[in-house]
Amino acid sequence: MTKISMVENAKVTACKLVGASIFVEAVISGRWRDKIESIRRTYQMTMEQAGGDSKRASAAISRIKRKLPAVIWAGEFSKREANGLKEYSGLLVIDLDHLGTKLTKAKEKLSSDPHVFACFVSPSGNGLKAVFNVPSDIERHADAWATAAKRVESLTGIKPDHGNDVARLCFASHDPEAYHNPHAVELEIETTPTLEEEKPT
């Protein structure tokens, strides 16, 4: 089973290992349900008070959200820093935020992609986390992220948030209808040309 790293909350740097599929199953089964439902109530209440301003609502839950457990999909880390990576998992996460009415359709599109290992609703209830299976080569992580982000935009018409940091945190969530495909097909990476490789126009 593919292993990823988990921290108790955003302030903690010490990591422990957890199976990637075990984490997804915990999102589905409701391990963090009470905490997530409380966060989503705060988010919705702020949305109503702020006239539908999702950015203000996100700011309102930011401090609470950072108390949640979180994983680093990229693999096994000795500490929560890029230089703490011990073994690359070949999994990376793409974030889609502030989706509103676009969420359901976007989730359907992403869940139909053979390269998606998991797709679930974020803690706010207004975003998605899409986890892709990519080649297990840390040297190609940036290109892998760019390829996955491009694919997400092609599938959904929505530009993902930029976040190719190999030690990027993904907070625990609750989604009984999360998509999970432990046999996701590895995504072929498109290599970004270097300055030397780029041809003059």
What residue spans do the PLM features occupy?
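DNA replication initiation on ssDNA origins
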Residues: M1-G90, E196-T201
